């Protein structure tokens, strides 16, 4: 998706040129990146737009994790779990309300010992 490439370009080349000034964690660009990875374009755009509007001296700031809606289906517990999955776990879904979850990114790399 072109939005993800633009955001990564901003984070890699433009963001280091200015001081860190985001009032929230995760930063607005990281928040936008997570939104565009997990939501459709329009929902991600509007939630990012309103987040950037809140990132000013009139708001307190703090932790503001993205919220996503997701349907989880019960899994069949009769099979053996596969621990050597091809994809590494990237996000945690922390319950918020009904089918709404906070999205928290895992930042630590797994090391084989």
Curated annotation (Swiss-Prot):
Its main location: membrane. The keyword Membrane applies. SMART domains: Haemolytic. GO terms for cellular component: plasma membrane. Pfam families: YidD (PF01809). The keyword Transmembrane helix does not apply. It is a peripheral membrane protein. It is found in: Cell inner membrane. It comes from the Bacteria. Keywords: Cell inner membrane, Cell membrane, Membrane. InterPro entries: Membr_insert_effic_factor_YidD (IPR002696). PANTHER family: MEMBRANE PROTEIN INSERTION EFFICIENCY FACTOR-RELATED (PTHR33383:SF1). Belongs to the UPF0161 family. Could be involved in insertion of integral membrane proteins into the membrane. This is Putative membrane protein insertion efficiency factor. The lineage of its organism: Bacteria, Pseudomonadati, Campylobacterota, Epsilonproteobacteria, Campylobacterales.
């Amino acid at each position: 998706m072109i939005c993800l490439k633009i955001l990564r370009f901003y984070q890699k080349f433009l963001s280091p040129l200015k001081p860190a000034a985001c009032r929230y964690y995760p930063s607005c660009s990281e928040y936008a990146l997570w939104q565009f990875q997990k939501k459709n374009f329009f929902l991600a755009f509007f939630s990012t737009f309103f987040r950037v509007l809140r990132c000013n001296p009139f708001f307190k700031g703090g932790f503001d994790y993205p919220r996503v809606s997701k349907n989880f289906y019960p899994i069949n517990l009769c099979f053996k779990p596969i621990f050597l999955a091809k994809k590494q776990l990237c996000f945690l879904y922390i319950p918020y309300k009904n089918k709404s979850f906070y999205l928290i990114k895992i930042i630590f790399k797994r090391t084989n010992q």
